[in-house]
Amino acid sequence: MKIIKRSGMEDTFDIKKIEAAIRKANESVIDYEKLTEEKIQEILANVEKACENMKRSPSVEEIQDMVENQIMNQRAFNVARNYITYRYKRALVRKSNSTDEQILSLLECTNEEVKQENSNKNPTVNSVQRDYMAGEVSKDITRRFLLDGDIVEAHEQGIIHFHDADYFAQHMHNCCLVNLEDMLQNGTVISETMIDRPKSFSTACNIATQAIAQIASSQYGGQSISLSHLAPFVDVSRQKFRKTVREELTATGIEPTEEMVNKIAEMRVKEEINRGVQMIQYQVITLMTTNGQAPFVTVFMYLDEVPEGQLRDDLAAVIEEVLHQRIQGVKNEKGVFITPAFPKLIYVLEEDNIREGSRYWYLTRLAAECTAKRMVPDYISEKIMKKLKQGNCYTCMGCRSFLTVYKDENDKFKFYGRFNQGVVTLNLVDVACSSGRDMNKFWELMDERLELCHRALMARHERLKGTPSDVAPILWQNGALARLKKGETIDKLLYGGYSTISLGYAGLCECTRYMKGVSHTDPDGTPFALEVMRHLNDACAKWKAEHNIDFSLYGTPLESTTYKFAKCLQKRFGIIPGVTDKNYITNSYHVHVTEEMSAFDKLKFESQFQELSPGGAISYVEVPNMQNNLDAVLSVMQYIYDNIMYAELNTKSDYCQECGYSGEIKIVNDKDGKLVWECPNCGNRDQNKMSVARRTCGYIGTQFWNQGRTQEIKERVLHL
């Protein structure tokens, strides 16, 4: 059995250390107050059994809590007092410098928690370690100086989650929709270098990737670009090719005809599109930003975003090439084509592409093939989104964070160039368990916790207020988000709906199960779950009216935090069957991963909750290998179009570098009960010698996960 030390390092469970600590406390009291040998052995046996029953590696703090409780259960109160006093003194010593051990353990790659914190960061790489070092300092400053004590305490107890504290010391926002059109059409500045309007499609793609890298280094969340902003440059290349082809033919003594010029020019256009798309794919996954990872970028593919005619045909050609290249994948260091994590792709389902025989059906079928093999694209229903977003269809910012509808000073809808200020998530399971199933107390606690979230969100807002545009010129001065003057603050962009700020929520499923005794999919549980969602939205509306800031409700994609919340719940409330008995809690409004349900029923059920998450949410269905059953994939896509705004299909895409096995690499328990990945063909368990891709929070993760998320992945049932 393993334990997690305070530094985050993993170590072997040693009952003798616990015994030594108990005996030391026991020796410091008078004889008649001492624990007997029999009672000491009973305490040790109970603690060891409790640790084994956790089915994960307990932390040192959790073990010490168990020891305290066991000593007090024996009514040896003076022994317990001495044990607690010693523990407190050690805590004071550690607090005097709270970051040293954490930083040293991540530099030496011995910190298990950091290793598994982010499934798209490799913690052994120097640039990632530098980011983690800076993050530890930021978290320390945030805890000690920037946040109120009760907010810090609530965060540490898992009552709320104050996201991205590792970046909070700086004046940075979360995620955005890049106004690539403005940057390309009107020129921009990157690293103090003027970039004019590009003269070809491939140059436009190159500028886009440079902008993506700079933007990723200036914020901590995801970003999205639209192919519709690149598509106009296909015709720029076309006209250039027509001119050069005519000149080349004339120079060789051939009288050029229009048919001849067009045919050769279109061949070159196709090659140009191939080059440009390949540049985006490879640049994005090979670029390293200042936060030590490839940019978290989403590419939006929406045909109706441009007018019919040549421009839409060019956009369709670009989309087709993106899908072809993603189906192929990218080569790993062994030269094997695998599934890349980025860019994430989103394809809009619309009347012109959703039915067989429609004009762009061939693209939708290609998208289905791509999803079956590479897990992307994800899908937005134009029909449903327009119903929910005042007739508009637009992409999320990165994974799932959606902007609210906003009109500019000219009364025109505006989405590109807007951003999110940050997120604070409420643990709904903790609200429920803290209420003891008393419904009046539940709503009272809910309002208390919401006010805590409100104050935490305003701390985020205040951290951005007064920020000069000079902190990130590409964002605020050079078109990615705005064209502010040097020295001008970003304040006007924080109000009036231009940007959003998000109240996240997690664990609606377990919250309902605790309060109502049934899943939120049960007819007896659904009304309560919907009432919770409406209550959260009402809070956002109230705060919006109070501050003139667009608060919106957001279905949080817990990645590593799911494990933290689960551990905190177990510590505070023990193991409650169906509620706290897993090492994860369910994301947002999702159906529990173990609940049997068809893909269509799941999407239909979750659609009503997605409508109540205007700040962002995504639904998914878990499917087997569908590469030989594209008709089934297409039927799910058509169901998405008719029933839900935003959804994705999860499949498996793994490769073992030891034996060449391609298929699903399994999750098994090792001798210490730890969940590990194992090739079913050769038994390889070396994570450095396998390529595993799983969807964990809207993005595809490729760097493995903590024990809580790994358990969740293992327990997912198929919906098709």
Can you annotate each of these PLM segments?
Residues 89-497, 518, 522-685, 691:
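Conserved catalytic cores of very large enzyme subunits
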Residues 14, 668, 696-699:
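Conformational switch/transducer regions in large eukaryotic molecular machines and scaffolds
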Residues 681-720:
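Long insertion/accessory domains within large nucleic-acid-processing enzymes
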Residues 273-277, 281, 513-514, 709-715:
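Metallocofactor- and cofactor-centric catalytic cores in central/energy metabolism, strongly enriched
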Residues 501-514, 534, 695:
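Contiguous, well-ordered alpha-helical segments that form the cores/surfaces of helical PPI scaffolds
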Residues 13-15, 417, 693:
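Non-cofactor substrate-recognition interfaces
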